[in-house]
C-alpha cells in the first residue's frame, strides 16, 4: 500500500519528494502483476489418504492474475527457481505501483494548491 504523505508539507518539500520519486522510478523488465498462490488439493483416487481425512497433496504453486473475465490460474510453477522468480517479479511490480501512487498523490496535492505539474 502506498504511503500517504503529510499534506502539511510545504510545496517545496512536495516538489523535492516528487523529483526524488522520479529519479527512483525504475521499471524492472521482470515486473509482473500477478499473485503466487499456494494450494493443497485432493487427488482423484477414492482410497487415497487425502480422501480419508489425511493431509491433502501439495503444496502446488500457481501464478494467478485478475483479468476482465475474472481470476485466471495461469500455470503451475513446479521449480523453486520459478517460484522465486515469480515472487521477485511480483515484488518489483508492487514497488513500482507504490512509487507511482505516491507520485499521483503529490501531483493531486500540487493541483489542489493550484501549482503546475510540469517542470519537476
Language model feature labels by segment:
Residues 1-120:
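A positively charged, amphipathic N-terminal helix/segment that binds anionic biomolecules
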Amino acid at each position: 500500500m502506498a504511503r500517504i504523505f503529510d499534506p502539511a508539507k510545504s510545496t517545496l518539500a512536495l516538489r523535492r519528494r516528487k523529483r526524488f520519486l522520479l529519479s527512483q522510478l525504475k521499471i524492472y523488465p521482470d515486473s509482473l502483476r500477478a499473485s503466487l498462490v499456494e494450494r493443497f488439493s485432493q487427488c482423484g483416487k477414492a482410497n487415497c489418504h487425502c480422501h480419508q481425512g489425511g493431509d491433502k497433496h501439495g503444496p502446488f504453486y500457481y501464478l494467478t492474475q485478475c483479468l476482465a473475465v475474472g481470476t485466471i490460474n495461469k500455470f503451475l510453477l513446479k521449480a523453486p527457481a520459478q517460484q522465486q522468480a515469480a515472487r521477485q517479479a511480483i515484488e518489483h511490480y508492487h514497488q513500482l505501483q507504490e512509487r507511482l501512487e505516491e507520485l499521483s498523490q503529490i501531483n493531486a496535492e500540487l493541483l489542489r494548491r493550484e501549482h503546475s505539474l510540469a517542470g519537476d
